[in-house]
Amino acid sequence: MHRGAATQGLVFTTPLSPFILPFAVDTPLLQVDALLKQYDTGGDEPLTVLRDLDLAVQEGEILAIVGESGTGKSTLLHLLGALDRPTDGTVRFAGTDLFAKSDEELAAFRNRSIGFVFQFHHLLPEFTALENVAMPALIQHRSLADVTPRAHELLALLGLDDRADHRPRTLSGGEKQRVAIARALMNEPALVLMDEPTGNLDARTAEPLHREIERLSREMDHTFVLASHDPSLAEVAGRVLRLEHGTLHPLAAADEMAPEAGPSDDGHAGG
């Protein structure tokens, strides 16, 4: 297989601190209690995006969080994935309080235990599809040669086995998102967070990707949390919650949702 010159013999050597999590059988994979997220806007009062939010996600569950743009879906996923810290409240992963950990420990935790898929894929343009998929393992100071079989396996699983040597500029929008999903699964994470993963695709391109996400959730041992304004994506979930006024409300079925147009939020006060 041809490898891009940018990653010939590439290996990351920066050591990461171990992040060992005890996991009782009856403990939710994710437990969120009284979560508060505010931002300083320079005015008299902070901007409150999430308030008094509680959530439990069981191992193996597929949860959809829906809501209009600007309601804080992306902000919530950033907190669940330890990309940001809350103003108050706790997020426990397998019983362990994430935000009692140092930034270095959280970085190690994220790379090992969380897979992220965002609306905009952020693939590295100078790398091939395979090299982009392998990136989470390379960050864990594994060599490209060692992780190539796993990356090939994931690309094949998503119907991209003939695109391994292609760079992002030669891929369609749907193919790029499949590469992003494969990358999120590279380290076999316990939790996969998907923030508007089909939000920038048209309906014709998005529908097959919805089916792929549903199939992956059935066939692979992962927990999925999907955030979307798109009700058709939420249909793959076993449980649907609406984020409104900074907190979560249950929905009886995905068909209770009205389609909403709009992109993901910017991490401060949106989607």
Curated annotation (Swiss-Prot):
PROSITE patterns: ABC_TRANSPORTER_1, ABC_TRANSPORTER_2, LOLD
Keyword Translocase: yes
Enzyme class (EC, first level): translocase
Keywords of the record: ATP-binding, Cell inner membrane, Cell membrane, Membrane, Nucleotide-binding, Translocase, Transport
Domain (ABC transporter): residue spans on this chain: 30-270
Compartments where found: Cell inner membrane
One example GO MF annotation: ATP hydrolysis activity
SUPFAM superfamilies, A to Z: P-loop containing nucleoside triphosphate hydrolases
EC number: 7.6.2.-
Protein name according to UniProt: Lipoprotein-releasing system ATP-binding protein LolD
Organism whose genome encodes this protein: Salinibacter ruber (strain DSM 13855 / M31)
Name of the gene this protein is made from: lolD
